[in-house]
From Swiss-Prot:
It is found in: Cellular thylakoid membrane. This is Cytochrome b6-f complex subunit 5. It comes from the Bacteria. The lineage of its organism: Bacteria, Bacillati, Cyanobacteriota, Cyanophyceae, Oscillatoriophycideae. Belongs to the PetG family. It comes from Trichodesmium erythraeum (strain IMS101).
Length: 37
């Protein structure tokens, strides 16, 4: 019963990491546009 929980945790971590990276890139992109414009 531990494997499904572990796979769920790993999947959650991957999703959180991807969303975090995307959010950081979006913030940097917005900041760059503000500086250029």
């Amino acid at each position: 019963m531990v494997e499904p929980l572990l796979s769920g945790v790993v999947l959650g971590l991957i999703l959180v990491t991807l969303s975090g990276l995307f959010f950081a890139a979006y913030q940097q992109y917005k900041r760059g546009n503000q500086l250029n414009g």
